């Protein structure tokens, strides 16, 4: 199959999960937390996108993003210092109202006009809380072949012994571990692929 990633826009949410590591993000965000003394968490997702042929990447920041800007610079290290596409760091304010976003839907609302101007047919969205090398090429090809509106990635990992029989309920989700002794759980890794027009249409319907 022809590499569809050249027709994909990458969107990264660098502040996701900041609230889970408050002591580490007093002066930075999740994406700029050091990893192995040499890298930052954003490096893994950004490099994965670039290595798969995605050359137009937007990082929608919310707060404490100066360290991220210092680290990324113009994007030259990733060959993203371009006149067309390249690396875009989007500030946390929309054109219609001055309000810092609190979630991914509001973050997308801040760049809605930007999305409308993009030429890419597909959008790949990711957080920066996982250190991994991910094959976005395979994911997007599977997305196109399936004809799905949205494709989400997950991984399988063992469930710790102490939580295999636990149940938790929150305002956001319900999940149960190992009612029948199951030892493997499917964990959503917050990587998504969709059509760019679908992304815009869903916001206009539900969020505008």
What are these regions (language model features)?
Residues 1-208:
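Unchanged
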